[in-house]
């Protein structure tokens, strides 16, 4: 018995279209991260990027459970003294709804070059898709 080693030319990528309206952020992000990593493929190996492409539409209609709409915070720092900016989920979803899903998915991918390569296969739209996208789920 021998082990099959996957080569880059053998990788076949599909395009998954997911509608985020009414879905809970964390559950959607885990589903997307699994697809981007290719974990459900029989040829999965942790050192290769064999995942599929994912297009998410209606990011502005995502939901959170509980009181997280007001309690969840996003922070960033400018690098200057006193440069900490704190925003709640309510404010961020209005300004840049794409960022919320990208941020959640990025945290579930490997924190390495491979993870940075995987996140490039994710496309998020705030509203309906631009162009032609095949729907799934």
Language-model features: locations:
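Ribosome large-subunit tunnel/peptidyl-transferase-proximal elements
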Residues: 1-103, 113, 126, 131-137
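Acidic, metal-associated active-site segment
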Residues: 106
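Positively charged, solvent-exposed patches that mediate nucleic-acid binding
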Residues: 119
């Amino acid at each position: 018995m021998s082990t099959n080693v996957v080569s880059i030319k053998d990788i076949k990528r599909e395009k998954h279209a997911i509608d985020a309206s009414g879905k809970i952020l964390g559950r959607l992000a885990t589903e997307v991260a699994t697809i981007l990593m290719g974990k459900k493929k029989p040829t999965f190996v942790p050192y290769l990027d064999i995942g599929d492409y994912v297009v998410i539409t209606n990011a502005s209609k995502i939901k959170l459970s509980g009181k997280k709409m007001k309690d969840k915070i996003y922070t960033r720092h400018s690098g200057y003294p006193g440069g900490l900016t704190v925003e709640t989920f309510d404010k961020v979803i209005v300004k840049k709804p794409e960022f919320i899903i990208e941020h959640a998915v990025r945290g579930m991918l490997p924190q390495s070059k491979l993870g940075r390569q995987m996140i490039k296969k994710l496309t998020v739209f705030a509203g309906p898709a631009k162009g032609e996208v095949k729907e799934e789920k």
